[in-house]
């Protein structure tokens, strides 16, 4: 899909480990049958004093969208017009959000040819045309959610687009760092979706993501959304800022698959469940893997003990990813020691921060005049990329 490889330019964080569990279906004997396809990707990297930790959970059949979004976001943050330690927190929040939205726009631009071709094939009304449309639909259905933690010295920023979680904890307290999960039962999402004239129950989760173009840009083709005032699924993220509490010892990021699996087995307080199950192992990676394995066992045990007539627990377990970050015990003091060198290192790049983005040339003249023509043309001609 392009734009790959930006991630590989930066070193990995040694304070973090990643654990994963594949999705599976339970057989009639209630044994898990693993699905070998893994749709998500994750990162733990740094560029000088800026650390990034992120999980990108792909859905609807492929990991290409998740990989693209992860790599492109790294470029947006560290590449041209980078985020730097000299920015004030409110500026970082604004830039973090804007750069994620740039990624969403870039993704749409990369799929312009497919969307254009799809409109042409729809008019053919032939078997060949229908087959081509089905193939394109399979591609443009792919999407990804994202949860990204960025640490700049003692400031912590959480970007969430979807239904994953970031949690901070010590031996006594647990703090959920992102307050909203973008699901159809979230009060804020219910208000947003109802305001579009849509019944929230007709919108499958997640209600925010990048990609999923049939619901974000071709939504009027769906019967339940044909009279909607706007798309039921959007790519606008939430970005929240907080100071790192010196008492925090751990950060944990959990994918939407973890959240869904735990909800299915009726875990009411997911952050507390995470803190109870977190046991430090020999390495950060083994700690992360042990944590996600414990979630997998919990789901399997609940399914195994359920009655055959109990349909509350699905025979499908979602794939899961956990990132575990071990914070230094004297984290705040270490940050102050790094601060002066961070300022001098990043000053030279900060001068380019406020350069305006250029508007790309996009040829939209061959778009067919369907329902989405004016909307797609306006979107592609007016939004910036890179």
Curated annotation (Swiss-Prot):
Xref: SMART domains: PP2Cc
Source organism superkingdom: Eukaryota
UniProt-recorded Gene Ontology molecular function terms: mitogen-activated protein kinase binding; mitogen-activated protein kinase kinase kinase binding; protein kinase activator activity; protein serine/threonine phosphatase activity
Site (Required for interaction with mom-4): 364
GO biological process, alphabetically ordered: endodermal cell fate specification; negative regulation of gene expression, epigenetic; negative regulation of Ras protein signal transduction; regulation of intracellular signal transduction
Domain PPM-type phosphatase residue range list: 22-327
Pfam short name (any one): PP2C
Mutant lacking the gene: phenotype: RNAi-mediated knockdown causes no obvious phenotype. Results in a 3-fold increase in the number of animals lacking a gut in a mom-4 (or11) mutant background.
Biological role: Involved in the Wnt signaling pathway by regulating mom-4 kinase activity.
Subunit structure: Interacts with mom-4; the interaction enhances mom-4 kinase activity.
Protein name: TGF-beta-activated kinase 1 and MAP3K7-binding protein 1
Species this protein is from: Caenorhabditis elegans
């Amino acid at each position: 899909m392009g734009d790959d490889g930006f991630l590989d330019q930066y070193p990995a964080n040694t304070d973090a480990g990643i654990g994963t569990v594949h999705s599976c279906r339970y057989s009639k004997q209630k044994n898990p049958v693993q699905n070998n396809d893994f749709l998500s990707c994750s990162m733990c990297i740094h560029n000088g004093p800026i650390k990034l930790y992120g999980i990108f959970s792909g859905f609807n059949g492929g990991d290409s969208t998740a990989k693209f979004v992860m790599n492109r976001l790294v470029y947006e943050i560290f590449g041209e017009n980078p985020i730097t330690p000299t920015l004030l927190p409110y500026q970082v929040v604004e830039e973090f959000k804007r750069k994620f939205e740039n990624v969403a726009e870039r993704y749409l631009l990369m799929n312009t040819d497919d969307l254009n071709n799809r409109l042409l094939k729809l008019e053919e009304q032939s078997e060949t045309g229908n087959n081509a449309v089905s193939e394109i639909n399979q591609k443009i259905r792919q999407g990804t959610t994202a949860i990204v933690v960025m640490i700049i010295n003692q400031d912590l920023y959480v970007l969430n687009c979807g239904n994953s979680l970031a949690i901070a904890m010590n031996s006594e307290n647990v703090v959920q760092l992102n307050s909203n999960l973008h699901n159809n039962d979230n009060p804020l999402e219910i208000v947003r979706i109802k305001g579009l004239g849509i019944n929230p129950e007709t919108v499958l989760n997640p209600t925010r993501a990048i990609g999923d173009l049939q619901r974000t840009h071709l939504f009027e083709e769906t019967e339940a959304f044909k009279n909607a005032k706007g798309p039921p699924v959007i790519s606008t993220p939430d970005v929240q800022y907080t100071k790192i509490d010196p008492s925090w010892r751990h950060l944990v990021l959990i994918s939407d698959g973890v959240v869904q699996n735990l909800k299915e087995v009726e875990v009411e307080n997911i952050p507390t469940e995470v803190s109870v199950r977190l046991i430090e192992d020999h390495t950060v990676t083994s700690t992360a893997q042990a944590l996600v394995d414990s979630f997998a066992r919990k789901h399997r045990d609940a399914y195994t003990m359920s009655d055959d007539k109990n349909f509350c627990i699905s025979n499908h377990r979602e794939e899961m990813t956990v990132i575990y970050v071990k914070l230094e015990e004297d984290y705040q003091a270490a940050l102050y020691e790094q601060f002066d060198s961070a300022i001098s290192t990043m000053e030279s790049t900060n001068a380019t921060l406020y350069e305006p983005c250029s508007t790309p040339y996009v040829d939209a003249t061959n778009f067919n005049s369907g329902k989405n023509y004016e909307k797609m043309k306006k979107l592609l001609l007016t939004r910036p990329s890179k």
